Amino acid sequence: MSEEQLNKHTAPGHAKPRVAVLFGGRSSEHAVSCVTAAGVLGAIDYDKYDVIPIGIAKTGQWVLVSGDTRQWSLSASSLPEVSPSARTVTLAEIGGEHQLIVASPNEVPQELGAVDVVFPLLHGPFGEDGTIQGLLELSDTRYVGAGVLASAVGMDKHYMKVVFEAAGLQVGPYIAVTDRQWLTDPEAIRKRVDRLGYPVFVKPARAGSSMGISKVDSLEGLDAAIAAAREHDLKLVIEAGIVGREIECAVLEGRGTEPPRTSMPGEIAVAPGEHEFYDFNAKYVEDDAASLSCPADLPDEAIARVRELAAAAFDAVGAEGLSRVDFFYTPDGELIINEINTMPGFTPKSMYPQMWAASGLGYAELIDELIYLALNRKTGLR
């Protein structure tokens, strides 16, 4: 992004665009969000941007984060967390501008000034699901990533599939289970699952990072898997197991009227052993539990088709900024869309930036491009 382009969108009184990096949140993916933020805060160009790190504690409190968050990492014994503070951050309208205010008991509130763009690195409910996007829309604040509707659809695995099917994209067999349905007639649910055929995957409808997901091979394990998923969400999606390779594709919004850009597809391979599928530990905790091959070893026509379908999925939900689209590639060459993630993991080791790196766009450049897209996107209905 050129200096002229940056200055065009910089609030009066700012030498460079002010970027509020928002992370943490109330969801069970709080720690993952913190690690994502650590990656971005470690790579963003501080010569180009005035960066304000804002954490959301699990209580919902917004705090100004100090210290070296770039060292945060995930391990079996270490889950980073935003700590509540007496000094809270709010977004308030002052002099016709929406500004960040730091307030604490018995102190005069401190004005941090206007924000040019918010980079919400929030995963899961109350952040990735349209809630924070709605707040930012109400305050007429530009932000990175998908808008309210696309974020909400991308968070709900049930309605995501409804939208994909309406757009002519092939999804696998599944059922959606509401809280009321399970509580009032669990036997009917067991029969519906039996018709899907085992194995099945039981998932919280509105959770990510493989939280609460179980593979179930028979009726005997179904109720326990449902109970585990319901700890994360009372609405569930139960999917028939699909034999196929796990293929992913990164999507980046096009500039202006250009179509979405797609990376070379990558393939996830889970190492043989204790992980039956790509679960939370394989994703984030154990370095050798899974590997990414990019570009995936696929025929040229399959690679082209993955990229075409990934862009179609991006457009189907009305996404903006970035998304990662996941597929199954079956032995007979079918591509079945699994899901779209409108705020994918964004550490330097995450699949989304790795696929772009393999496609010629580095991590710092990717951050620049996302901020550029947000600064140049109009607010309000679009």
UniProtKB/Swiss-Prot annotation:
Pathway: Cell wall biogenesis; peptidoglycan biosynthesis. Its EC number is 6.3.2.4. GO terms for biological process: cell wall organization; peptidoglycan biosynthetic process; regulation of cell shape. NCBIfam families: D_ala_D_alaTIGR (TIGR01205), PRK01966.1-4 (NF002528). Keywords: ATP-binding, Cell shape, Cell wall biogenesis/degradation, Cytoplasm, Ligase, Magnesium, Manganese, Metal-binding, Nucleotide-binding, Peptidoglycan synthesis. Its cofactor is Mg(2+); Mn(2+). It is an enzyme of class 6 (ligase). This is D-alanine--D-alanine ligase. Mg(2+) 2 binds at residues 339, 341. Belongs to the D-alanine--D-alanine ligase family. InterPro entries: ATP-grasp, ATP_grasp_subdomain_1, D-Ala_lig_Van_CS, D_ala_D_ala, Dala_Dala_lig_C, Dala_Dala_lig_N, PreATP-grasp_dom_sf. Mg(2+) 1 binds at residues 326, 339. It comes from Arthrobacter sp. (strain FB24). PANTHER family: D-ALANINE--D-ALANINE LIGASE, D-ALANINE--D-ALANINE LIGASE A. Cell wall formation.
